[in-house]
Amino acid sequence: MKNIHKIFSPEKKGKEKISVVTCYDFSFARILGETPIDSILVGDSLGMVFQGNSSTLPVTLEEMIYHTKVVRRGAPDKFIIADLPFLSYQTSIEEGIRSAGRMMKETDCDAVKIEGGSDFICELVAILKQIGIPVMGHLGLTPQSVHVFGGHRVQGKGEESSAKLLREAVALSESGAFSIVLEMIPAELGKRVSEEVGVPTIGIGAGPDCDGQVLVLNDLLGLDANFQPKFLKKFSNLHSIVKDAIESYHEEVRSGEFPGKDHSF
């Protein structure tokens, strides 16, 4: 585990960018543990990327706890943030405390992330901080509210919408959130929010002026050939690499070339 103040210190704003990667499993977490990446997010996006659902809504707290435990085993020295899934904190302050407490106790994660910037959410953030649970906020396109937004659309485009997002970002910061994810908002708004709030902003489709960036590991590795949102840069093409390797294995099994002498006892 790493010190939160070394990675998400407000003093680093505008100086050193923060790199965050979303991961769900032991094997990839172990690789991330060998890299200089600053932090790992165990996101409820696993509902779509790992489980094949059309949204994050079906993901349960038990599933998030399971995956966060697995990632911690693979990356014991990384700063790990775990998403609290849909309806694990929205029903009451008490439920939010229980869910966040379970996540911290049972997974050994370093912080939790919750979506939204309402008065209720800000109150929950403040209370969680008081009892010793660091909270990362999340504004813009908040996937747990996808039905309210009418799909995965860019948020904060109008004057009223952008002003509301800025107010919520300031409120989250003042309530004690140590960092805020900004998802799918105009780059200019991402810059403005980053300048206005006193904590690091982590962007995903929020422009280059955020204090850091986050991408899903599967996405940046190019595991899904059909997934290409505008904000995504693929740093590899693992879809083709994996497909070619499996086809080679299949051909060698069919031909009898594998297993050969080197792979037999």
Curated annotation (Swiss-Prot):
SUPFAM superfamilies: Phosphoenolpyruvate/pyruvate domain. It catalyses: 3-methyl-2-oxobutanoate + (6R)-5,10-methylene-5,6,7,8-tetrahydrofolate + H2O = 2-dehydropantoate + (6S)-5,6,7,8-tetrahydrofolate. Binds 1 Mg(2+) ion per subunit. Its main location: cytoplasm. CDD domains: KPHMT-like. The keyword Cytoplasm applies. GO terms for biological process: pantothenate biosynthetic process. Its EC number is 2.1.2.11. It is found in: Cytoplasm. GO terms for cellular component: cytoplasm. The active site is at E183 (proton acceptor). Mg(2+) binds at D44, D83, E115. It comes from the Bacteria. InterPro entries: Pantoate_hydroxy_MeTrfase (IPR003700), Pyrv/PenolPyrv_kinase-like_dom (IPR015813), Pyrv_kinase-like_dom_sf (IPR040442). Its cofactor is Mg(2+). Keywords: Cytoplasm, Magnesium, Metal-binding, Pantothenate biosynthesis, Transferase. GO terms for molecular function: 3-methyl-2-oxobutanoate hydroxymethyltransferase activity; magnesium ion binding. Belongs to the PanB family. HAMAP family: PanB. NCBIfam families: panB (TIGR00222), PRK00311.1 (NF001452). Homodecamer; pentamer of dimers. This is 3-methyl-2-oxobutanoate hydroxymethyltransferase. It comes from Leptospira borgpetersenii serovar Hardjo-bovis (strain L550).
